[in-house]
């Protein structure tokens, strides 16, 4: 019993003025992002927001610099540290950060247990192996 009155009105067609690059950026903005955090550590602060994100006087300039450098400046993820964990999803790549520091001797086959160890520090060796990954 559908009549002509029950149909939806015809909507005007929108012109597509966007280039392919802009449509890719819009598609990327609609993706769901789940933040990643490191394990909880006592030395990491409970909550820390970078000062340049709180500076309202030069906010537009700071956002332009962040965009030029490829740093995420979204409103939902302001904190660099949250609940004694470090945010891992919008920072520098971990391998790049490790290259900036002093060179270290990397032992790939470090034993997990040594009978000569006074404290049998398996926790330290596990942490070392985890950092190599």
Swiss-Prot record:
Its main location: cytoplasm. Expressed in sperm. GO terms for cellular component: axonemal B tubule inner sheath; sperm flagellum. InterPro entries: SPMIP10 (IPR027965). It comes from the Eukaryota. It is found in: Cytoplasm, Cytoskeleton, Flagellum axoneme. One of its GO terms (biological process) is flagellated sperm motility. Pfam families: SPMIP10-like. Keywords: Cell projection, Cilium, Cytoplasm, Cytoskeleton, Flagellum. Microtubule inner protein (MIP) part of the dynein-decorated doublet microtubules (DMTs) in flagellum axoneme, which is required for flagellum beating. May serve to reinforce and thus stabilize the microtubule structure in the sperm flagella. Involved in the regulation of sperm motility. Microtubule inner protein component of sperm flagellar doublet microtubules. This is Sperm-associated microtubule inner protein 10. It comes from Bos taurus.
């Amino acid at each position: 019993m559908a009549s002509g009155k029950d149909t939806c009105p015809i909507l005007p067609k929108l012109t597509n003025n966007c280039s392919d690059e802009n449509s890719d950026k819009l598609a990327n903005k609609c993706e769901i992002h789940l933040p990643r955090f490191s394990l909880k550590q006592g030395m990491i602060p409970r909550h820390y927001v970078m000062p340049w994100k709180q500076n309202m006087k030069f906010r537009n300039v700071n956002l332009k610099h962040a965009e030029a450098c490829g740093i995420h400046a979204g409103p939902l993820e302001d904190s660099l540290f949250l609940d004694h964990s470090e945010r891992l999803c919008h920072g520098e790549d971990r391998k790049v950060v490790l290259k900036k520091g002093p060179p270290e001797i990397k032992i790939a086959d470090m034993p997990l247990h040594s009978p000569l160890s006074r404290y049998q520090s398996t926790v330290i060796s596990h942490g070392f192996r985890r950092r190599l990954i």
